[in-house]
UniProtKB/Swiss-Prot annotation:
The lineage of its organism: Eukaryota, Metazoa, Chordata, Craniata, Vertebrata. It comes from Mus musculus (Mouse). Disruption phenotype: In knockout mice decreased number of Paneth cells in intestinal crypts, decreased proliferation and increased goblet cells in the intestinal villi. Increased weight loss following intestinal wounding, increased inflammation, distorted tissue architecture, muscle thickening and greater crypt loss. Delayed dermal wound repair. SEPTIN4 and XIAP double knockout mice show delayed dermal wound repair and hair follicle regeneration, via increased apoptosis of hair follicle stem cells. Its EC number is 2.3.2.27. This is E3 ubiquitin-protein ligase XIAP. It is an enzyme of class 2 (transferase). Signal peptide: none annotated. Its main location: cytoplasm. It is found in: Cytoplasm; Nucleus.
Length: 496
C-alpha cells in the first residue's frame, strides 16, 4: 500500500504497525532527529511534536502513523499545518490511533496516558476516544502546540464566568496591589483572597506578585497562552443575566448581539454628532456603533465596548486587541491578523517599558522578548540576543510597530551588522587621497563575487554577515571564504 503524495512530499510504503507503536511516544520520535540539519527553519522538537520521524535524508520527515513524508521546510511553516494539509485523515493529527484491544491515545503531547503541557494545571484525564477530532485539530492549527482537550471541565470555575461575579470577588483586594479589580476581572481573573493572588475562571491559572508595569491581559496571555479564554474560544458560558457578558466570550454565538446594527448604514447613522478624532467611517466598518455618550462605541456582534480613543488608534486593531474572539472580526480580518495584533502589542508593551531599569523588570522584559518565536529563530541562526533586542527597540521607536515577519527582522539584523563593520573599518583605516576613477574601480570590484569575479554579490552569510559571493557560487560553499565560519543561513540581498 502506498500514500499518494502532494507537492513537498514523497511516496513511502507503509511500515509495520507494531513497529509504528514505538513512536507513539514523542521522546522516541525525537531521538530519530540526532543527525537532523541544525540549519532547518523548523526545529526537530517541533517536527517530533507534530508526529514526524527523521528519515535521514536532507530535511525529509515522515509521520509515524500515516507515513506521509514532507521536505523543503521554509521559515514560517507550521509543522502541524502542513501535516494536516497533506494527510487530513491521519489518525495522529486527528487525535486517534490504532486500537489494540483498548483505545490507545496518540494525541500529540500525551505520554503514558497523560497530557504534557508547559502550563499544566492539575492532573490530566485520559483522552476520550469518542471526542470529535475537530476540537483537537482546531487547537493544533491555531496555537501550533498541544493543549488539553481531555475530559477536564471548562471553565474551571463556572461561578466566575461573568465579569460581574469576578468583580465582586475583589471586595477585600489589598490596598498595596498595583492593578485595579476592573482590569483583572476584564482579563478573566478573580481574587482568591490570598495576598494579591488571582485566578483565571477558565484555565485555573494563578498569578500573583503584581508589579506597577504589569498588564493583566498580557500576563495572563504570557503565562497561560493556551487558556481557552485567552484564545477567545466558545466554552458555552453565560453571564448572570443569561446573556454573554461584554468581556467574557465575544464569539460565543454566531448571532449578533444587536442585529439592528448589523448593517454598516445603520451603524454610521449613530455617529451623527461624533466629535472624536477617530474616523467614524473606520469605526463603523470595524463593527462599532456610537452609544451617544462621549466617545463610547460598541460592537454590534460581540457587544464589546471601547472608549477613551486616541487619535492614532486604529478601530480594527483595538477590536482585535480587546475582543479577539468576535466572530465579525474573525470573518472580516481572519485569525492571522488577530494573532499578529496580539504579538505586536505584547512586544511593544514589553519594549516600551525599558525606561524603567530595575533588574527584575529588565529580566521580565527580556524573558518576554525571548519567548517570541521569531527571536528564537534568529538566535538559532547565530544572531545575539543583545543585537536582536536592540534592533527590535529601534524598529518600534522609528515606526511605532514591531516586526511581523522573520525575513524583515533578519534583513535588518544583517544590515545592522554590516553598518557596524563599516563604521569600525572607517575609524581604523587611514584616509587616502585617491582619484575619482580609482574610487569607481574599487566600488565596482567590491560588488563582484570574490570567487568567480564575474557576477555581482547577491548573498550574505549568517552568522558572520560577510558579503562575498553571487547566488551561484554561494550554493557551493558551506563555510565563509573570508572567515571560515560555518554558514547556518544564506540570505539573498539586492545591491543597488
Amino acid at each position: 500500500m502506498t500514500f499518494n503524495s502532494f507537492e513537498g512530499t514523497r511516496t513511502f510504503v507503509l511500515a509495520d504497525t507494531n513497529k509504528d507503536e514505538e513512536f507513539v511516544e514523542e521522546f522516541n520520535r525525537l531521538k530519530t532527529f540526532a543527525n537532523f540539519p541544525s540549519s532547518s527553519p523548523v526545529s526537530a522538537s517541533t517536527l517530533a511534536r507534530a508526529g514526524f520521524l527523521y528519515t535521514g535524508e536532507g530535511d525529509t520527515v515522515q509521520c509515524f502513523s500515516c507515513h506521509a513524508a514532507i521536505d523543503r521546510w521554509q521559515y514560517g511553516d507550521s509543522a502541524v499545518g502542513r501535516h494536516r494539509r497533506i494527510s487530513p485523515n491521519c489518525r495522529f493529527i486527528n487525535g486517534f490511533y490504532f486500537e489494540n484491544g483498548a483505545a490507545q491515545s496518540t494525541n500529540p503531547g500525551i505520554q503514558n496516558g497523560q497530557y504534557k503541557s508547559e502550563n499544566c494545571v492539575g492532573n490530566r484525564n485520559p483522552f476520550a476516544p469518542d471526542r470529535p477530532p475537530e476540537t483537537h485539530a482546531d487547537y493544533l492549527l491555531r496555537t501550533g502546540q498541544v493543549v488539553d482537550i481531555s475530559d477536564t471541565i471548562y471553565p474551571r470555575n463556572p461561578a466566575m464566568c461573568s465579569e460581574e461575579a469576578r468583580l465582586k470577588s475583589f471586595q477585600n483586594w489589598p490596598d498595596y496591589a498595583h492593578l485595579t479589580p476592573r482590569e483583572l476581572a476584564s482579563a478573566g481573573l478573580y481574587y482568591t483572597g490570598a495576598d494579591d493572588q488571582v485566578q483565571c475562571f477558565c484555565c485555573g491559572g494563578k498569578l500573583k506578585n503584581w508589579e506597577p508595569c504589569d498588564r493583566a491581559w498580557s500576563e495572563h496571555r504570557r503565562h497561560f497562552p493556551n487558556c481557552f479564554f485567552v484564545l477567545g474560544r466558545n466554552v458555552n458560558v453565560r453571564s448572570e443575566s443569561g446573556v454573554s457578558s461584554d468581556r467574557n466570550f465575544p464569539n460565543s454565538t454566531n448571532s449578533p448581539r444587536n442585529p439592528a446594527m448589523a448593517e454598516y448604514e445603520a451603524r454610521i447613522v449613530t455617529f451623527g454628532t461624533w466629535t472624536s478624532s477617530v474616523n467614524k467611517e473606520q469605526l463603523a466598518r470595524a463593527g462599532f456603533y456610537a452609544l451617544g455618550e462621549g466617545d463610547k462605541v460598541k460592537c454590534f456582534h460581540c457587544g464589546g465596548g471601547l472608549t477613551d480613543w486616541k487619535p492614532s488608534e486604529d478601530p480594527w486593531e483595538q477590536h482585535a486587541k480587546w475582543y479577539p474572539g468576535c466572530k465579525y472580526l474573525l470573518d472580516e480580518k481572519g485569525q492571522e491578523y488577530i494573532n499578529n495584533i496580539h504579538l505586536t502589542h505584547s512586544l511593544e508593551e514589553s519594549l516600551g517599558r525599558t525606561a524603567e531599569k530595575t533588574p527584575s523588570l529588565t529580566k521580565k522584559i527580556d524573558d518576554t522578548i525571548f519567548q517570541n518565536p521569531m527571536v528564537q529563530e534568529a538566535i538559532r541562526m547565530g544572531f545575539s540576543f543583545k543585537d536582536i533586542k536592540k534592533t527590535m527597540e529601534e524598529k518600534i521607536q522609528t515606526s511605532g510597530s514591531s516586526y511581523l515577519s522573520l525575513e524583515v527582522l533578519i534583513a535588518d539584523l544583517v544590515s545592522a551588522q554590516k553598518d557596524n563593520t563599516e563604521d569600525e573599518s572607517s575609524q581604523t583605516s587611514l584616509q587616502k587621497d585617491i582619484s575619482t576613477e580609482e574610487q569607481l574601480r574599487r566600488l565596482q570590484e567590491e560588488k563582484l563575487c570574490k570567487i568567480c569575479m564575474d557576477r555581482n554579490i547577491a548573498i550574505v552569510f549568517v552568522p558572520c554577515g560577510h558579503l562575498v559571493t553571487c547566488k551561484q557560487c554561494a550554493e557551493a560553499v558551506d563555510k565563509c571564504p573570508m572567515c571560515y565560519t560555518v554558514i547556518t543561513f544564506k540570505q539573498k540581498i539586492f545591491m543597488s
